[in-house]
Amino acid sequence: MKRSLWIAKVIAMIIIPSIWLMCINAWAQEIRYITPEALKELVEKDDDTILIVDTQPKAAYKMGHIKRAINFPWTPEIKNPADLPRDRILVLYCDCTNEEDSIDMAKQLLRNLEYVYVRVLKGGWSQWQKLGYPTEKNSD
């Protein structure tokens, strides 16, 4: 009986901290959003602590994108994020109904590639355009 109790205590000492750590990791990797209004302010200030990332295909990016955005198209598995610095806040956006591509890319960056500063633009490209915020086009 004492041995069974001792084994149960040891198992509890191992399992409880593991569950606690899993919960903390899940919370830490929660997707965070930025509003179009907040991003517009940062764009207007030429804030270089952010990097705006258009996750749409290159053709869509060329047709129009948020001012100062770079193009890093969504892919099911990010292989080489060398163009995405770790020391800046990455603001991801797409033209999906519920920001699916941006959310997926954010999850990949946070969970698989251990990025820390990642945000998703609430409402995405369509909301940005609807509000009439600054855009630009590339012809290359």
What are these model-derived regions, one by one?
Residues K2-I34, I50, K62-I89, N98-D140:
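Rhodanese-like catalytic fold shared by cysteine-dependent sulfurtransferases
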Residues E37-D47:
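A short acidic-Thr-Gly-centered motif at the start of a beta-strand
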Residues I52-D54:
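Structural scaffold elements adjacent to functional motifs in cytosolic proteins
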Residues P57-K58, D95-T97:
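Solvent-exposed coil/turn segments that connect beta secondary-structure elements
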